[in-house]
C-alpha cells in the first residue's frame, strides 16, 4: 500500500472515531425500574428491548418505555455518560428524565 492510500485510510478512521452519532437513553421497565443504555439508533434499540431481544435485564421486565435520550455524542462520551447515569441515585435519574432531553 502506498503512502497516500495509508494516509487516506488513517484520515477516514479518524473521522469515524470522532463521529457524534451515539445517544444515551433511559427506559422505564414494566416493574418500574429504570434501565440506561447507549445506541446509535435509539428507536431501533428500544424496539429490540420491547421485543425481548435487548439486554437480559429488560427481557424479564417488559414492557419498556423510552423516557429520556441524549443524542449527538461520540461513542466514548456516550459510554461515560451511561456510566455516570448508572451510578446516580434514582432521584437524580428522575430529575434527568424531566430535563430538556425528554423523549
Protein language model annotation of sequence segments:
Residues 1-55, 59-72, 76-86, 90-103:
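GIY-YIG nuclease catalytic motif and its immediate N-terminal context
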Amino acid at each position: 500500500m502506498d503512502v497516500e492510500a495509508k494516509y487516506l485510510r488513517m484520515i477516514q478512521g479518524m473521522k469515524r472515531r470522532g463521529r457524534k452519532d451515539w445517544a444515551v437513553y433511559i427506559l422505564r421497565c414494566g416493574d418500574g425500574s429504570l434501565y440506561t443504555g447507549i445506541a446509535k439508533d435509539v428507536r431501533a434499540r428500544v424496539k429490540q428491548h420491547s421485543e425481548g431481544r435487548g439486554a437480559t435485564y429488560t427481557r424479564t421486565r417488559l414492557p419498556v418505555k423510552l423516557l429520556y435520550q441524549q443524542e449527538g455524542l461520540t461513542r466514548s462520551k456516550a459510554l461515560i455518560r451511561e456510566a455516570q447515569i448508572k451510578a446516580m441515585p434514582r432521584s437524580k435519574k428522575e430529575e434527568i428524565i424531566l430535563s430538556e432531553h425528554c423523549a
